[in-house]
Amino acid sequence: MKNKKSKNQQFAVIGLGRFGSTVAKTLFEKGEEVLAVDIKEEVITEAHEYTTHAVVADVTDERTLRALGIENFDVVIIGIASDLEASVLCALTCKEIGVKKVIAKAENLKHKMVLERVGADEVVIPEMEMGEKMGARLANPL
């Protein structure tokens, strides 16, 4: 018998580049509630198709995050990696206002270390992780 979840989780995906938009689409397709947030209006216009809600906002401002009710989400995924300051400020503020779980994307190991120090619960470096998986697969073909 398959174990069903009693309720959908609520996810906020901040930063809708390739990583963030893919995470948001996948969660939405799996039936989860997804709030998409980005500073670019054209990105948010597109995001309405694959999210529950999509909002243009500056996530470096604590008042903005509070107005979005970000602390009420089960998981916040921060896909901003190219702007180190925005990424770190967003992660720090999310943790300070009570977000239970923050997952953040980093560009490199130093960025990862900073995100961990400000309280991110999980930090991913997608390019590195995929490179490691591919290398392992190529070294051990079936």
Question: In which residue ranges do the predicted regions lie?
Answer:
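Cytosolic regulatory regions of ion transport systems
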Residues: 1-142
